[in-house]
Amino acid sequence: MSLSMIELAMQILSCSQKELASKLSVSPTQITKWKKGEYMSFDMENKVRKLLDIGDLDPNVILAFGHISHAQKWQKIITQLAKSANDNGETGFKVAPLIDEADFVLSNLVDSLRMIGYKFPLSFPPELENDYDHYIDWSDSFIETIYSNEFCSLIYNIFRSFVDVYSFYVAYISELDTQLLIENSEFSSLIIDIEASLLNLAIIKADTELPELRGFQKLKREIEKDYREWLQQLKLYAFKSNIPLRAELLHLIDDEHDNLGVEAEAEYLGFNDNRLHPDIYMNELLIGMRLLHQVLPVILDKLEIKDFDIDNESLRKF
């Protein structure tokens, strides 16, 4: 945040590093430290925001769109696209980040798209100008104009993917740690990691042209690698803790986002009430076999059966 804040300040104020230091009453050396990523205090951040008159806008978002007014207008449109994606979702689950944390989602989205080399529109199309603050007040023709816009279509498709991915997470993963009899910080940390990267997972699953970008495949490899590792560990913890799974968690990586949405909807509607993941059945079988291994010698001894030959041929009969 400190690097982007300084970059934005020098851009908006059209000043040198030395001049900016004077305006902020700090040394030029401190500006250099911030540019290298050193933490900027909350009070200093507020001072810079007030100087630039950017309110609560993320400086990275402003830099991406090239101008404060453009960023504000796109923020308004994207916030409504997020709400629309949630409302049009068919999983039954509320996708809380799209409703309650739209600004945070926008910041993460901008960071991820910039990372893979996406070029944001540096102007705001006049046909998207609108005085209404909520998409339910938009006319049909204006909505059609929005979805025909290439950038808006991209964002909406990512959000639709996020609805399915997040719903699967809520349906099958988010509350697993509450079922632990003994608190396990590593188990809880895994679930936090899984949730934190869901937007990136949605980006690589969305039906877009982003795979053509130079950085997309790198992001895809990293995200799939991380999730495979996290989910395998999570399954192992669940198995050892006798926590039932109602779905194969690796579907989160391997399946298309539409299929994840269908699985989430099935859980929401209660279709999985009597279904358990095969790992749970296997665990029950293993426990039963171990119990027999403990009990049988005691039974044989009590019955004074000393010589017992195993009939291997009969074991192979069905």
What is each model feature region?
Residues 1-13:
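A short, Lys/Arg-rich alpha-helix, primarily the initiator
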Residues 9, 16-24, 31:
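Short alpha-helical "recognition helix" segments of helix-turn-helix
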Residues 24-40:
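Recognition helix of helix-turn-helix/homeodomain-like DNA-binding domains
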Residues 42-60:
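DNA major-groove recognition helix of helix-turn-helix/homeodomain DNA-binding modules
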Residues 61-134:
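Helix-turn-helix/homeodomain-like alpha-helical modules used for DNA recognition
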Residues 111-277, 281:
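Long, charge-rich C-terminal accessory regions
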Residues 260-318:
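Alpha-helical oligomerization segments
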